[in-house]
Amino acid sequence: TNMSLKDFAFEIASSLEKVDSNTSRSLNELPHRLEEVIPGIINDSKSTNSASLLYAIKKLNFDGNLIICGDPRKEPKSYEVYGPQQVYIFGMHRNELMEKVKSRRSNIKTFSNLDLVLQDIKKADSKPNILFSPGNSSGKDFKNFEDRGNFFKDKVLEYFSDWKAHFFW
């Protein structure tokens, strides 16, 4: 089924917390919930657990570069990621995440920081196809998901703003 990003965001928000469809707060005000930074690059920093991460991959039928980070201590067991061609793990919790995240199709690469991840993607791909859906709490890397999402957005614009013009209608 084809679903708009706004409808998809509402569906995810509804599944994670009680959402009143008549609420005065617009879905556009939900920070970093499937936010398209530039075409081909989605910021889902609001994803703070494996269930929301796996749901986003499935709903978007995502097969590009997945970036995850954060503290996996709240995840009771390991989980398998299906779909993405490449999984990138970065940050202070990358070793713990490597023990939790499994992937049959994907190569998993780890880096100490987001800059190195984005440099690797830019070097390898002719066009960006990125889902930043951490799937964990921020842990030691960021203050919260909003801080994390803003940082990701700034870095994407730093590394891919020259590609932006190629993807607008």
Question: Locations of the language-model features?
Answer:
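ATP-dependent carboxylate-amine ligase
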Residues: 1-19, 25-169
